[in-house]
Amino acid sequence: MARGPKKHLKRLAAPNHWMLDKLSGKWAPRPSSGPHKLRECLPLILVLRNRLKYALTKKEVTLILMQRLVKVDGKVRTDPNYPAGFMDVISIEKTKENFRLLFDPKGRFTLQRITPEEAKFKLARVTRVETGNQGIPYVHTDDGRTIRYPDPAISIHDTIKIDIESGKITAFIPFEVNNLCMIVGGHNLGRVGAVTHREKHPGSFDIVHVTDTAGHQFATRLSNVFIIGKASQTFVSLPAGKGVRRSRVDERNAALKRRGEKIETVA
């Protein structure tokens, strides 16, 4: 009979967006408890060892973190298995680098390099709006924050801009048609586009229709939509491709063009 929480994670059971190869061992790092779920996070050890190549082993990652040089959302983190998630800002003082954790158009975590000015804030989606004891209003966000006395105009599914140093709300983006969004779950994970229509289904899942800059249309659940900008102006810098998912044929033609080979078309 199992007693207590699980402490291990096999490599084959790890999320695909971690991009771990199957032949480098049997085990994968199991994320610690934190603001993001196991299958929606990227442990710090994978950030420093697998993505940035600043270390070769977990022991080296621990030595780096114990120098208290790595911050996530402005707080020093020394746990190699700390779960960093979507929109988190990772700062490394020694190298003066700042990264924001985003999804690429293929649905994989990517480290987007950002400027020091952009590293001062993060975006979070409002998941609940409540009124507590003595009539104090507060909101819950998808990264585990509870913020009191928000703007009365903020409602569920809106996105708030949080100042990392103070933890206060500096602006918010309402969930409206024509606003820019990124898909954070489902088959369209990582795609970016403008909200064109919202289908309401009482008692079931609301469906949101989105159109990207290439004119491709797709639909997803309301819970998978994260607003990142007003109209065509985004609040955060996006990875290469601007969230447009290309087809297999387009990717093949782009690869042939880079190599200088002839592109053959099938009639």
From Swiss-Prot:
Subcellular locations according to the entry: Cytoplasm
Organism encoding this protein: Dictyostelium discoideum (Social amoeba)
All residue ranges annotated as the S4 RNA-binding domain in the record: 42-104
Recorded family membership: Belongs to the eukaryotic ribosomal protein eS4 family.
Record's keyword annotation contains RNA-binding: yes
Keyword Magnesium: no
Major site of localization recorded for this protein: cytoplasm
One of the GO biological process terms: actin cytoskeleton organization
Keywords: Cytoplasm, Ribonucleoprotein, Ribosomal protein, RNA-binding, rRNA-binding
CC terms in the record's Gene Ontology section: cytoskeleton; cytosolic small ribosomal subunit; extracellular matrix; protein-containing complex
GO molecular function, a single term: RNA binding
Protein name: Small ribosomal subunit protein eS4
The organism's place on the tree of life at top rank: Eukaryota
CDD domains membership: KOW_RPS4, S4
